[in-house]
C-alpha cells in the first residue's frame, strides 16, 4: 500500500508529487475490494487522497482499533465519498458522509443518507467484527507503532 494514495503511477499521472505520500499506510486486512488500513505512524487518521484501484473502498482504522471512516474512489482514482464515524473533539457526533473532497459543504447525516451508503456501512461494520479488525489493529500497533 502506498502513501495517501496507492501508487506512484497514479501520483505521476495526476501530476502530484509522490514524495509526500509514500508509505503512510499498511493494509491489515483485505476482503475483495475492501482494504482495512492503519496509518504507519499511529498518528492522525486521514483517508488516502486517491487510490490506484478504481472503485476501491478503504476503511481507515484509528490507533485504538475503531473505524475512522469508509472511503470509496471513482474511475479517476479520487475520493468519491466518505462515511465518517464521530470521534472525540468532533463537532459532529453521529455517523455522517461527505461527497467528494468539496470543502465547506454540510455533511449528510445518517437519517438522510441514501440506503446504498447505509448498506455499505453495515457491510463494512459486519466484516470489521467478523474478521476481528479491532484485535488486528492492536497487534499491528504493538509491532509497528513506536
Language model features with spans:
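Catalytic toxin/effector domains delivered as secreted proteins or via bacterial secretion systems
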Residues: 2-146
